[in-house]
A protein has these predicted regions:
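Short solvent-exposed loop/turn micro-motifs enriched in small/polar/acidic residues
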Residues: 18-20, 164-165, 192-193
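Extended active-site neighborhood of metal-dependent phosphoesterases/phosphodiesterases
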Residues: 1-83, 110-111, 199-201
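Short, surface-exposed, charge-dense and proline/glycine-enriched linear segments
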Residues: 50, 114-123, 191-198
Length: 222
């Protein structure tokens, strides 16, 4: 993180305030005339692994003090905006636990169906776009880590959240009015043959509409 901060156009920092993790920060995008906040961008550290009380091992999550900071800062922005939430997008590595909870068991393998522990799962008609190629890997499922998405719904600002972590998933689903996007891995040393990313276009005149371009290098370069 310190290395990235040395780059001229890096807009992140180690943390906006003292809290768990590294790189938790909020970036505000001004309107074209500079008179108001048009968009808010959240960068959250979803951390890496956790050791559980029962000696198990799993992926970590965004912690309570991080969520508390998000809610405090979100309210500050809303207060500056006449009490209305400033439309926001959010980025973090590990997806929210609710992704798994949206899966439904199906009878057999097929398109956008994945196998896990001998059973088959799909988003069914909840899949808006993209592909489900592997079972999502959210925070440790033996504990309840659903507070973060509930917090977004409570504050009313986050319109879309973007995750990595699952290297070959690139699906889009929506939960409680919030769009959740998985994005392909872009690095060299990872599994799967496809690499990609997303180009996000924000329009200050249409706060509720975000244009997403999904880019897959396998097809862009062929």
């Amino acid at each position: 993180m310190i290395m990235y901060n040395d780059y001229q156009n890096c807009r992140s920092n180690l943390n906006d305030e003292e809290m768990y993790g590294c790189g938790n920060c909020n970036l505000v995008v001004k309107s074209s005339d500079g008179t108001k906040n048009a968009y808010s961008i959240w960068l959250m550290d979803s951390n890496d692994y956790m050791n559980t009380p029962d000696g198990d091992f799993g992926y970590n999550c965004v912690h309570k003090d991080q969520i508390d900071w998000y809610e405090k800062r979100s309210k500050e922005l809303a207060d500056e905006n006449g009490g209305k939430p400033v439309p926001a997008i959010l980025f973090q590595h590990i997806p929210v636990q609710q992704e798994i909870l949206e899966l439904q068991e199906v009878a057999e393998m097929g398109e956008n169906v994945v196998e896990h522990d001998g059973k088959f799962y799909s988003f069914g008609d909840k899949l808006i776009s993209g592909r489900l190629r592997e079972y999502p890997c959210p925070p440790y499922m033996k504990q309840d880590h659903t507070a973060q998405l509930k917090s977004w719904k409570k504050m009313g600002d986050v319109k879309a959240a973007f995750f990595g972590h699952d290297h070959v998933n690139d699906f889009h689903i929506r939960i409680d009015g919030i769009s959740l996007y998985q994005t392909l891995g872009a690095g060299y040393f990872t599994y799967g043959e496809e690499r990609g990313g997303r180009l996000i276009v924000l329009d200050e005149n249409t706060h509720l509409h975000i244009t997403i371009y999904h880019l897959c290098l396998k097809y862009e370069m062929s």
